[in-house]
Amino acid sequence: MESITISKIQNWKKNQIKFAAITAYDFSFSRLFEKEGIPIMLVGDSLGMTIQGHNSTLPVKIQDIKYHTKAVRRGAPNSFLLSDLPFMSYYSIEETLKNTAKIIQSGANMIKIEGGKWLVETVKELSKRSILVCGHIGLTPQSINFLSGYKIQGKEKNDAQRIIDEAFILEEAGIKMLVLECIPSLLAKKITENLSIPVIGIGSGHHTDGQILVMQDLLGITDGKKLKFVKNFLCHNGSIQNAIKQYINEVKNGNFPSEKYSF
């Protein structure tokens, strides 16, 4: 795979080329994902649940993201790599800059932060320093206690308008990519069509520019109740490689997520 850059991803949006992304946490899987053609990987704070066994992302520390970012970058030298800033690691500009430096130096191309209007100054300060920022709105897992659980956001008119406003405000502040999580498909469509930056969806329908899934969900190895937007790509494919190929193809063709996996 040739090196994936933010310019290339922006061109995909411009040319209406859909793309697949996946979470990755270690060398072996990231190497396999890159070999099979996954262009974008996220070292997500979801590792708190999938790797560390917690019941939320809240216990994850910046050291954890740093460690896993290094491992993923070794396995996937050419993929575009996002890394989360975990809970309370960006509560001040000074703390954000310090922690962002650690993650970028570990191999990430871009950092991802959760939240809306309150992040405007943070995004501006990072952008001034030529640091690529991905926003994350809708269901924000770091706010799980405030949101009273993992549930769809933006169903009510006022909440939908708030999410739309946040998307535009964050783009104006300088984010270069946006993740929409667990919002209605038509709301995600409206946001995607009206932003100039690439929009990646998870549980937000098929109208976004790209899709992302947690690797354990995609491979059907997550315990507990299966989320509506999760599809097991491994069960009928016989190998992880074939599962990844099917995922990429279904996203590119606009077949995933179908209505069955959307809100």
From Swiss-Prot:
PANTHER family: 3-METHYL-2-OXOBUTANOATE HYDROXYMETHYLTRANSFERASE. It catalyses: 3-methyl-2-oxobutanoate + (6R)-5,10-methylene-5,6,7,8-tetrahydrofolate + H2O = 2-dehydropantoate + (6S)-5,6,7,8-tetrahydrofolate. The lineage of its organism: Bacteria, Pseudomonadati, Pseudomonadota, Gammaproteobacteria, Enterobacterales. The gene is panB. It is found in: Cytoplasm. Mg(2+) binds at residues 45, 84, 114. Its cofactor is Mg(2+). GO terms for biological process: pantothenate biosynthetic process. CDD domains: KPHMT-like. The active site is at 181 (proton acceptor). Homodecamer; pentamer of dimers. Its main location: cytoplasm. GO terms for cellular component: cytoplasm. Keywords: Cytoplasm, Magnesium, Metal-binding, Pantothenate biosynthesis, Transferase. Binds 1 Mg(2+) ion per subunit. GO terms for molecular function: 3-methyl-2-oxobutanoate hydroxymethyltransferase activity; magnesium ion binding. Its EC number is 2.1.2.11. This is 3-methyl-2-oxobutanoate hydroxymethyltransferase.
